Curated annotation (Swiss-Prot):
The gene is folE. The lineage of its organism: Bacteria, Pseudomonadati, Pseudomonadota, Gammaproteobacteria, Enterobacterales. Pathway: Cofactor biosynthesis; 7,8-dihydroneopterin triphosphate biosynthesis; 7,8-dihydroneopterin triphosphate from GTP: step 1/1. Zn(2+) binds at C109, H112, C180. Pfam families: GTP_cyclohydroI (PF01227). The keyword Secreted does not apply. This is GTP cyclohydrolase 1. One of its GO terms (molecular function) is zinc ion binding. It comes from Sodalis glossinidius (strain morsitans).
């Protein structure tokens, strides 16, 4: 069994305590076993769709999908894949807003298993420590690599950063296109969904909140 890093355990425990963890079963199967079983079930699904799996183009598709699910687009279900985090003492006493904009993300709608394609803006006001900027992107990507709803994804990113940085002063906004809306159902090709989660001063201070929302508006503009 893989031993989780301290940071991964802290984030997982914080999400569980707040009821924000992705719904997961307790049983954890070995990755190779999961890939084998997923491939078997995908073979059955494709056969029920009347696809000919003896065709060269389709023969390996169940195995490709299984590998993609376990190792790539759903890798964020396994905290062993939580990014290595570098937290640095705030020796410079930075106390102004730090913002990372235009963080690209691709996730999967947990209702229809189709794409959520979006961008995130993340801000925080440092307290005792700061985080390597690329780590913010990696945390966004980790939680995006799960079956998701956008509301939970936004809150998971915020709570993870609050936990790691030791401050409530974190804000996250995600603007995304949902292919469950674009490619099926109503087939609206132009609508986007924006979800914002605010913590600490971003929620209690009107000036801080407006500064963050201006950063989001600047990106959207």
């Amino acid at each position: 069994m893989v031993t989780l890093t301290k940071e991964a355990s802290q984030v997982r425990d914080a999400l569980l305590a707040r009821g924000l963890e992705t719904p997961l079963r307790g049983e954890v199967l070995d990755n190779e076993v999961r890939k084998r079983l997923i491939a078997e079930h995908m073979t059955e699904i494709m056969t029920l769709l009347n696809l000919d799996l003896t065709d060269d183009s389709l023969a390996e598709t169940p195995h490709r999908i299984a590998k993609m699910y376990v190792e790539e687009i759903f890798a964020g279900l396994d905290y062993a894949n939580f990014p290595k985090i570098t937290v640095i003492e705030n020796k410079m006493k930075v106390d102004e807003m730090v913002t990372v904009r235009d963080i690209t993300l691709t996730s999967t709608c947990e209702h229809h298993f189709v794409i959520i394609d979006g961008k995130a803006t993340v801000s925080y006001i440092p307290k005792h420590c700061v985080i390597g900027l690329s780590k913010i992107n990696r945390i966004v990507q980790f939680f995006a690599q799960r079956p998701q709803v956008q509301e939970r994804l936004t809150q998971q990113i915020m709570l993870a950063l609050q936990t790691l940085l030791g401050t409530n002063n974190v804000a996250v906004s995600i603007d995304a296109v949902h292919y469950c809306v674009k490619a099926r159902g109503i087939r609206d090709a132009t609508s986007t969904t924006t979800i914002t989660s605010l913590g600490g001063l971003f929620k209690s201070s009107q000036n801080t909140r407006q500064e963050f929302l201006r950063a989001v508006t600047h990106y959207n503009g």
